[in-house]
Structures are given as structure tokens and as C-alpha cells.
């Protein structure tokens, strides 16, 4: 078998449907779009998925609920197992060092969670700690220090 002898399997390909090329083709005149109406017009495929033919859409019929709290604090989360892997004994962990090591993106508001084991004594400075994380840091002789977020 050579490269020029390759061809697709039987039934794997379809012939292109040539529409609007006369009644003898079987796909002339209305080009398989039926008679009148919105779906027979050009641009029919550009309608958004939520469009319901002009009736009030479902999304507008259901009541609004809740709100977005503008003062919600969004924490970047780091687990203890990540600190165990990336930091050495007696090193200081703060949002800046976490950002440098690629554990957080912004480092504006960091919360330390207690997933994993910590065997190294670390000084951890973060905006928030889970109870289990704080306990595990202190159990190995480390320091868990809460810092305040810098407001800009």
C-alpha cells in the first residue's frame, strides 16, 4: 500500500449537497428549507439559543433571586501539602513568596487549608487559616500569623 492508494472507508464520507441548482436536482427552488417562515430566511442560524420566537423568554419569566455581594472576600486557597512540597525548613511563607513559587496568582487574599501533612517548621503569614491548618502548623512548631489585606 502506498500513500496515493489511501482512501476513506466505504460510507465514511458524504457527497456535498448542492442546493438551489434547479428542480432536477431534487434540492432546487426552496433548497430543502420548506416554504415560508423564519427558518426559510437567510440568517436563521444566527438566532441565539434562548430565542423563543418572540414570546417572552423563559429566563425573563422566572423571578430574579439573590444578589452579588460586592464586599465578599475571595480567597486564593493553598493547602498544607503544597507548602510541604515547595518550602524548606524554617522558611517564611507569605503571599509574596507563594506568588513567586506559583502557588497563587495574585496573592491579594490567601487562605491556608489543612489538606495534607506538614513536617517542616514554617512561619506562615496569610489572611486566613482553617482550624485544621492552624493546628497542624503549630503542632510541628511553626507559626501561623494572620495578616490584614491591603486595601487599594
Curated annotation (Swiss-Prot):
Biased composition (Polar residues): 28-42
Source superkingdom: Bacteria
Record GO terms (molecular function): rRNA binding; structural constituent of ribosome
Region Disordered, annotated ranges: 1-55
Any Pfam family: Ribosomal_L27A
Keywords: Ribonucleoprotein, Ribosomal protein, RNA-binding, rRNA-binding
One Gene Ontology CC term in the entry: cytosolic large ribosomal subunit
An individual GO BP term: translation
Transmembrane regions listed in the UniProt entry: none
Function recorded in the entry: Binds to the 23S rRNA.
NCBIfam families from the UniProt entry: rplO_bact
Homology family: Belongs to the universal ribosomal protein uL15 family.
Description of how the protein assembles with itself and partners: Part of the 50S ribosomal subunit.
Protein name: Large ribosomal subunit protein uL15
Organism from which the protein derives: Sulfurihydrogenibium sp. (strain YO3AOP1)
Amino acid at each position: 500500500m502506498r500513500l496515493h492508494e489511501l482512501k476513506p472507508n466505504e460510507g465514511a464520507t458524504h457527497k456535498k449537497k448542492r442546493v438551489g441548482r434547479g428542480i432536477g436536482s431534487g434540492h432546487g427552488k426552496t433548497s430543502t428549507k420548506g416554504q415560508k417562515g423564519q427558518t426559510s430566511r437567510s440568517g436563521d442560524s444566527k438566532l441565539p439559543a434562548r430565542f423563543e420566537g418572540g414570546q417572552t423568554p423563559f429566563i425573563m419569566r422566572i423571578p430574579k433571586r439573590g444578589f452579588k455581594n460586592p464586599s465578599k472576600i475571595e480567597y486564593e486557597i493553598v493547602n498544607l501539602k503544597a507548602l510541604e512540597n515547595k518550602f524548606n525548613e524554617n522558611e517564611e511563607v507569605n503571599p509574596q513568596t507563594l506568588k513567586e513559587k506559583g502557588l497563587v496568582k495574585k496573592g491579594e487574599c490567601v487562605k491556608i487549608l489543612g489538606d495534607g501533612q506538614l513536617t517542616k517548621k514554617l512561619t506562615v503569614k496569610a489572611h486566613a487559616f482553617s482550624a485544621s491548618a492552624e493546628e497542624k502548623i503549630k503542632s510541628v512548631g511553626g507559626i501561623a500569623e494572620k495578616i490584614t489585606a491591603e486595601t487599594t
